[in-house]
């Protein structure tokens, strides 16, 4: 999608109709009518995968004490009470099942509600399509800086979890 770093509200951004139209065209091309397409959406789930903020050793106070994702300790399930992430209790449980089925360690990132928080396209996708969505990500240091840093194991673990999710073995 275009314009992800500035809000996604454009024709080519996640807030536009592109994903919705592509999915409907795929459904119609496989013989589904509109009612079947809508039923398929209702029965679907989505993983929004965008990196997560790892606790920075210079700024540990910026994380909730019980929710401090660390590099190379597994992907993080991301939660925000203002819905800046799409994760719900139901979709967090889905992600946990997927991680456990894949044999992948996982962590939880809960953004502090007294500090600003960025967002992902997860809430946009969930809102536009009505699909249960979970936001997950590889913990990284210095997000949006010239020197972002993540571990070597976390991307491999996330790839293994995505393979398990897409294979339906959870």
Task: Enumerate the language-model features and the residues they cover.
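Hydrophobic alpha-helical scaffolding
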Residues: 8-16, 81, 85, 111, ...
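Generic secondary-structure signature for well-ordered alpha-helical cores
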Residues: 24, 28-31, 97-105, 141, ...
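Active-site-adjacent substrate-binding region
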Residues: 54-140, 144-145
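His/Asp/Glu-rich mid-to-C-terminal helical/loop segments that flank catalytic regions of hydrolases
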Residues: 138-170
